[in-house]
């Protein structure tokens, strides 16, 4: 008889992050209150300089994502939250280079306090450590799995991509409403509508509050030979509360306007905000040729899908005054998979926010989007590559 399997260890509970300056010293202490000791790993990244602290098998109690933009010593700001299932992450943006000097666990009655002491470092020392950390990450990286070809006669696949998640909350509303929760809720409603119709298969890049990198989102859809990739987002422009309405984006090597360029720049920095390496600069030459040849048909189909979605939203909701836009979003760069990004509205606009927070408003929006996605996928098919994205 096989021995009983041990029960999974209960997650460590983290209760807040505190930055403590020491008077007369250039060092800084990071204090995290825990229910018990946890495995702690840390690394640094450059461009921009950041310190990343991972807590294994740990979840932050209370608010799922926390942070502050108030500068304290060498830290310009920080954020914390769930990074991967079973791992929480603290990311500190640095205004000068520092490294971890020591890590201690201090008992405080029934609880444990994690104390991480930082020390000043030169930029050369910091960059050298970042290079070592990067080599270690690459050595342990698991390659993407092979693509899974769609069997003959299979239903076309729609991949819904709720933006942000985990440590990355996305845009926020005036009372703490967060983009990551809104787009996940709308994605679930769209999936329900599509599954009820029964003519397409639906998968989601995330189904809970976890962080997924931009590249992983594209790989997820492309390796499953998706017929359409739909990334869902919401924006926020405080100080411009009159700006409202949904927009639909397709990939463009030149932004359609300044607002589109700003939106793409913000969304493309999601990985940096979560403590990942900044994306490498695009290679020139061959990639430019491949872009022109391989993407031409896909771009046309993406634009067709975008028009259909915009028309459907116009019938069921409120469009932005410039509803069809183009910009260089990283999640739209698959060369052989029609891809669109839908900004559902503005959390900084009272009318948009009300519609996105209420079940009736979400249902109405989801019904319109589902109808448009069905119309596109069932009536416009292109040959989808099964080559995995590298």
Regions from the language model: what does each represent?
Residues 132-286, 295-307, 315, 363, ...:
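Catalytic-core regions of hydrolytic enzymes
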Residues 41-43, 62-63, 167-171, 258, ...:
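Short, solvent-exposed loop/turn elements at domain surfaces
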Residues 1-157:
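Signal-peptide-cleaved, periplasmic/extracellular N-terminal interaction regions immediately downstream
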Residues 34-36, 55-57, 94-96, 116-120, ...:
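Flexible glycine-/small-residue-rich
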Residues 40, 53, 239, 290-390:
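Active-site-adjacent mobile loop/cap segments within catalytic or ligand-binding domains
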């Amino acid at each position: 008889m096989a021995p009983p399997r041990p029960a999974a260890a209960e997650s460590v509970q983290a209760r807040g992050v505190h930055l403590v300056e020491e008077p007369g010293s250039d060092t800084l202490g990071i204090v995290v209150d825990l229910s018990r000791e946890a495995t702690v790993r840390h690394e640094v990244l450059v461009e921009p300089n950041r310190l990343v602290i991972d807590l294994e098998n740990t979840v932050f109690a209370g608010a799922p994502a926390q942070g502050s933009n108030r500068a304290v010593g060498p830290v310009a700001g920080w954020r914390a939250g769930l990074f991967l299932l079973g791992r929480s992450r603290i990311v500190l943006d640095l205004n000068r280079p520092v490294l971890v000097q020591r890590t201690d666990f201090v008992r405080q009655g029934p609880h444990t306090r994690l104390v991480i002491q930082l020390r000043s470092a030169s930029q050369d020392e910091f960059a050298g450590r970042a290079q070592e950390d990067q080599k270690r990450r690459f050595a342990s990286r698991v390659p993407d799995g092979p693509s899974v070809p769609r069997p003959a006669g299979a239903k076309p696949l729609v991949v819904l991509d709720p933006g942000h998640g985990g440590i990355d909350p996305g845009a926020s509303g005036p009372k703490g409403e967060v983009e990551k929760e809104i787009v996940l809720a709308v994605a679930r409603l769209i999936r329900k509508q599509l599954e009820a119709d029964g003519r397409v298969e639906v998968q989601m890049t995330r189904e809970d509050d976890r962080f997924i990198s931009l590249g992983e989102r594209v790989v997820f859809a492309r390796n499953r030979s998706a017929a359409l990739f739909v990334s869902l987002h919401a924006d926020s422009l405080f100080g411009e509360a009159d700006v409202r309405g949904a927009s639909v984006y397709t990939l463009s090597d030149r932004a359609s306007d300044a607002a589109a360029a700003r939106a793409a720049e913000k969304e493309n920095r999601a990985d940096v905000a979560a403590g990942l390496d900044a994306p490498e600069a695009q290679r020139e030459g061959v990639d430019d040729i491949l872009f022109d040849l391989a993407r031409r048909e896909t771009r046309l189909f993406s634009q067709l899908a975008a028009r259909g979605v915009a028309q459907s939203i116009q019938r069921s909701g409120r469009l932005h005054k410039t509803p069809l836009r183009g910009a260089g979003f990283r999640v739209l760069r698959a060369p052989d998979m029609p891809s669109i990004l839908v900004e559902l509205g503005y959390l900084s606009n009272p009318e948009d926010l009300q519609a996105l927070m209420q079940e009736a408003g979400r249902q109405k929006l989801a019904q319109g989007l589902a109808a448009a996605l069905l119309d596109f996928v069932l009536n416009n098919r292109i040959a989808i590559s099964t080559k995995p994205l590298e």
